């Protein structure tokens, strides 16, 4: 985490290995950038967010509550609540709905025995 500005991380977040969160930025134009000027923009990650491995979160991004970010994503813009998003640049793929309650990767479902333990 490069935190020249605030980084707010909500409750019950999961981050896989090699997640990077950056708040720092530099000017685009070379002469201005060479002045060593640096700025920071706050990053906010909501509650119940899962960031897949090797995800990069860029300065100024707000990730809403109950979001899944796919592995290898580069998050350059805000992601709304209840979204599955992935890619470079990261884009919303779809909303998370009640139909996803028992879903695993590639639309597999949690088996009944495991589901009973989760619900206990």
Write out the residue ranges for each language-model feature.
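Short arginine-rich
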Residues: 77-82, 112
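Nucleotide-sugar donor-binding loop of glycosyltransferases
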Residues: 25, 78-79, 89, 96
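Short alpha-helix at the nucleotide-sugar/activated-sugar donor binding site of glycosyltransferases
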Residues: 14, 67-68
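Conserved catalytic segment of ABC-fold P-loop ATPases
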Residues: 64-67, 80-82
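Terminal amphipathic alpha-helical/low-complexity segments used for targeting or macromolecular assembly
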Residues: 89-120
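Short beta-to-alpha loop/turn elements within the nucleotide-binding domains of ABC transporters
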Residues: 61, 73, 79, 88
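Flexible, glycine/small-residue-enriched loop-and-beta-strand segment within the central core
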Residues: 1-62, 96-97, 102
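Short-chain dehydrogenase/reductase
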Residues: 50, 68, 74, 84-86
């Amino acid at each position: 985490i490069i935190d020249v500005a605030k980084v707010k991380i909500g409750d019950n977040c999961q981050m896989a290995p090699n997640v990077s969160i950056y708040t720092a930025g530099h000017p685009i134009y070379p002469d201005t950038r060479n002045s060593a000027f640096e700025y920071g923009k706050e990053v906010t990650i909501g509650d119940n967010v899962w960031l897949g491995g090797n995800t990069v979160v860029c300065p100024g991004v707000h990730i809403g509550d109950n979001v899944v970010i796919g592995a290898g994503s580069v998050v350059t813009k805000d992601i709304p609540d209840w979204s599955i998003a992935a890619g470079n640049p990261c884009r919303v793929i779809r909303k998370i709905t009640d139909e996803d309650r028992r879903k695993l990767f590639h639309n597999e479902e949690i088996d009944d025995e495991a589901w009973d333990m989760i619900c206990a």
